[in-house]
Amino acid sequence: MAKVQYFGTGRRKKSVARVRLVAGDGKVIINNRDIENYFPIETLRVIVNQPLVLTETKDKYDVLVNVHGGGFTGQAGAVRHGISRALVKADENMKSSLKKAGFLTRDPRMKERKKYGLKKARRSPQFSKR
């Protein structure tokens, strides 16, 4: 009999995470590396584990993630979004608590584009009176 897997795709800023949940003992593997090695900052690991802690499924599933694009924070948010979506596919009853916590909502905030005549998105060149 094949192992039951649940898939979820998460996005945040420029990052895209493809998440697989497999029945297991709570290991989180990101890009073939352990979560402690991939996210050295504790707050990022907390962000990734939030949906599992909220639904009390930390020890039920192994989480296998493939994530690319963006930086650390964007990738952590994308992984959290993907795990939440996969948990909903695994158990529909978790949807209300995850939605209430805001983990199923795609964060729409993106980097604002640079405009011509300006140094950055909103920063204008230095003004000289004389």
Swiss-Prot record:
Record's keyword annotation contains Heme: no
Matches recorded under InterPro entries: Ribosomal_Su5_D2-typ_SF (IPR020568), Ribosomal_uS9 (IPR000754), Ribosomal_uS9_bac/plastid (IPR023035), Ribosomal_uS9_CS (IPR020574), Ribsml_uS5_D2-typ_fold_subgr (IPR014721)
GO biological process, any: translation
Compositionally biased spans, kind Basic residues: 111-130
Gene3D superfamilies registered for this protein in UniProt: 3.30.230.10
Family: Belongs to the universal ribosomal protein uS9 family.
The protein's name: Small ribosomal subunit protein uS9
